[in-house]
Design a protein with these regions (language model features):
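Acidic, PIN/NYN-like endoribonuclease modules and their adjacent C-terminal/linker elements
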Residues: 1-3, 101, 105-131
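Short, well-structured N-terminal submotif of metal-dependent ribonuclease cores
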Residues: 1-35, 45-63
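Histidine- and aromatic-rich ligand-binding microenvironments
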Residues: 7, 36, 93-94, 115-116
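Generic structural signal for small/hydrophobic residues in well-ordered secondary structure
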Residues: 7-8, 43, 79, 104, ...
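Alpha-helix capping/helix-boundary segments
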Residues: 10-11, 75, 100, 117-118
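Active-site neighborhoods of divalent-metal-dependent phosphate/nucleic-acid chemistry enzymes
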Residues: 67-112
Length: 131
């Protein structure tokens, strides 16, 4: 599979701010866009935690319009390799970011983020910044 996997940071940015350039890019690439089920979980948690009226509905509307990829056992192969390499290099990564990055690698997808710093050390991960 190829295409773009949007991480939690860029997804949250799109949901909350709806910047015209990103909305246009979203529509232009709609067939090739996905999020990891881990991103869906983080977005739903964030909306519940914030308790802001209407945010949960915005998150659900976003998730209805994008393909949500399940995390399967095939993701455990790149996860194990990437985590071990990063820890050996003294560059550990946050758990959810590592799960999402591993998911993108396993699918051969480019990860789209606003936070290049979090993902720049992941071996084998293609990353783009759209903001």
């Amino acid at each position: 599979m190829s295409g773009f996997m949007l991480d939690t940071d860029i997804s949250s940015y799109i949901i909350k701010r709806r910047p015209a350039t990103l909305v246009a890019k979203f529509k232009q690439n709609a067939e090739t866009l996905s999020v990891s089920v881990m991103t869906a979980a983080e977005l739903r948690f964030g909306a519940e935690k914030a308790g802001r009226p209407g945010l949960t509905e915005l998150v659900e509307e976003y998730l209805e319009r994008i393909n949500i990829l399940d995390w399967t056992s095939e993701v455990t192969v790149p996860y194990g390799r990437i985590r071990a390499e990063l820890e050996r290099a003294g560059k550990p990564m946050g758990s959810m970011d590592l799960l999402i990055a591993s998911h993108a690698v396993s699918q051969g997808m480019t990860l789209v983020t606003n936070n290049l710093k979090h993902f720049s050390n992941v071996p084998g991960l293609k990353v783009e910044v759209w903001s």
